């Protein structure tokens, strides 16, 4: 049987962007959120609902207004040497002097906008971590998705976690161990599944991205949009 971290109510399964009863700083002590800890072989993640519904709704509206997404060539991804349209919208924001390379693209982030700074600062406050870059992914509905991958780019600061903050529709999120992938896996390792609620924070701690791939699969029943912010600590570009 697959492992589960969170079981939301039926409203979440319909993709309406509602979150379960707040379990984190949104309703209690901001600096002491109610974390749910997910542990497996080589996997270390922590989950909480960080923003209550009213605040999460407000942030979602501001993200829809303020974030400028890639178009043209920047809206394509390279897979096995071929270029394909990205099945979601993407944008990058961060500190000056940074670049980030993934899927065949080298990107220079846009300057921070207020809503992204506000979310970043909240995440830093409750985790004690610092982040200088964010990748924004917008999924218009359950047909938009991202395949199995690891966030292991060379620009990432060694030993730094990745903070994933979700707004909008609740979506399934799946971890698969690198040894259990493909038609002839080396061995069987339980898949780890969770559902990322509106206003939630998932901390992916080392060495998770060394051993586990993660994905956001197609879910046609989900009709509402979702915006995900993955905050990272990037090494300055060498000159």
From Swiss-Prot:
- UniProt source species: Mus musculus
Occurrences of domain Fe2OG dioxygenase (ranges) = 130-235
Q: Which GO terms describe its biological process?
A: DNA alkylation repair
- Cofactor dependency: Fe(2+)
Q: What is this protein called?
A: DNA oxidative demethylase ALKBH2
Q: Which InterPro entries match?
A: AlkB-like, AlkB-like_sf, ALKBH2, Oxoglu/Fe-dep_dioxygenase_dom
A Pfam family reported for this protein in Swiss-Prot or TrEMBL: 2OG-FeII_Oxy_2
Activity regulation, in the record's words, is: Activated by magnesium ions.
Q: Give the family from UniProt.
A: Belongs to the alkB family.
State the EC number(s).
1.14.11.33
